[in-house]
Amino acid sequence: MSSSQNDIPEPVFVGGSARSGTHAIGRLLGSHPNDLQLPIESRFHCGTGGLTDLLNGNTDIDAYRERCLGKWWQRGLRQHLGLKRLIERDDLEAALERLRAGLDDDPLQAGSRFVREILDPLAERAGKPVWVDLSGANIRQAPTLLKLFPRARFIHMVRDGRAVTAAILKKRDMTDDLAQAFGHWEMRVRRSDAALRQMPPDAVLTIYLDDLTAHDREAQFARIVDYLRMDDPAPMRAYFDETISPERAHVGAWRERMAPADARWVDRRYRRLVRQLRREGIDWVPEPGGQ
């Protein structure tokens, strides 16, 4: 990135539908010496009932505090994820009290300071000026996050809805309901589009997973480098060449990842939905093509 640390765009928020490649691009960015991929999706800043909802009046500080110290403190099948990976509990409680105290005077400043109290020390200990968060709701909450972090960058990961559906069905801790899996993709698309319409031009970089991994690798890699103002992308380039591949992303393999009847159902629904979304002006979803 830029040799002047003040010119480095930070932080970086990556978001999109579940199973759309957010973690793949997070690891790619984390291979750069300046970028720390956070060890978890932090969620506390953008999830439902999170900090952005607090700042927008959709929840209150007591309910938010309870979430931070409760369901967001530890989560996952083995309860190994959550804020406990990022901060000591006593430090989190103290930061929450400072957030409470600052909300009346300057809520945006208080919110930004709260996020930085939790996440900046991780990057500082790693000797990196930028942290990268992969919470799925980052794009949905991008308009508020941009107010908190005016120098932030947002990467919107997009993937064919049929491939997302197949990947969700394969994920043990998500769902095995076909309609629910497909509905998740549609919901995320609509919510993301509503947020994107509120963002300034060129504030968000949209990356199609299939293009990044298979169809347009060089151009997509260059777009990421330019967007993040990277002076020396060589370490990231090495990771990209060695690790980012069509095979790992299961490009074009969604039919093989579900039962034939389910694949036909998803294909029909996807083609109809893409036409409907186009009519609504949502023109960034991948075309079904001949797949």
Name the predicted role of every residue range.
Residues 23-35:
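A conserved segment at the C-terminal end of the G1
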Residues 58-60, 64-91, 134, 139-145, ...:
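Anion-recognition interface
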Residues 97-235, 257:
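PAPS-dependent sulfotransferase catalytic domain
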Residues 17:
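P-loop (Walker A) phosphate-binding loop of NTP-binding proteins
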